[in-house]
From Swiss-Prot:
One GO cellular component term: chloroplast
One function term, GO molecular function aspect: structural constituent of ribosome
Domain of life the protein comes from: Eukaryota
Subunit structure: Part of the 30S ribosomal subunit.
Listed name of the protein: Small ribosomal subunit protein bS18c
One Pfam family this sequence matches: Ribosomal_S18
Family recorded in the similarity comment: Belongs to the bacterial ribosomal protein bS18 family.
UniProt-annotated location(s): Plastid, Chloroplast
Gene: rps18
InterPro entries for this protein: Ribosomal_bS18 (IPR001648), Ribosomal_bS18_CS (IPR018275), Ribosomal_bS18_sf (IPR036870)
PROSITE patterns in the cross-refs: RIBOSOMAL_S18
GO biological processes: translation
Keyword vocabulary terms for this entry: Chloroplast, Plastid, Ribonucleoprotein, Ribosomal protein, RNA-binding, rRNA-binding
Length: 101
């Protein structure tokens, strides 16, 4: 190939496959808190399949396990560890009008 055609070819990058998040020996159970907590967001929401990189069956089992743990009070429904600071709302104060009588 001459030099002009060579610049258009894409370089082949090696594709690194990530390890599956659930190994074959892992037990998907509502009591396995170390496993379940990996699939919950900071806000306490169940992460999607695309984010987790799980199969459909694994995602269903994780979802059921998380819901069982929530019902049995092993997991909170909402994660309230973050204390949200309430700041003054500037939109409300600037939008007020005074009525002239």
């Amino acid at each position: 190939m001459d030099k002009s055609k060579r610049s258009f070819l894409k370089s082949k990058r090696s594709v690194r496959r990530r390890l599956p998040p659930i190994q074959s020996g892992d037990l998907i159970d509502y009591r396995n808190m170390s496993l379940i907590s990996r699939f919950i967001s900071e806000q306490g929401k169940i992460l999607s399949r695309r984010v987790n990189r799980l199969t459909l069956k694994q995602q269903r089992l994780i979802t059921v396990a998380i819901k069982q743990a929530r019902i049995l009070s092993l997991l909170p429904f909402l994660n309230n560890e973050k204390q949200f600071e309430r700041t003054e709302s500037t939109a409300r104060t600037t939008g007020l009008r005074t009525r002239n009588k």
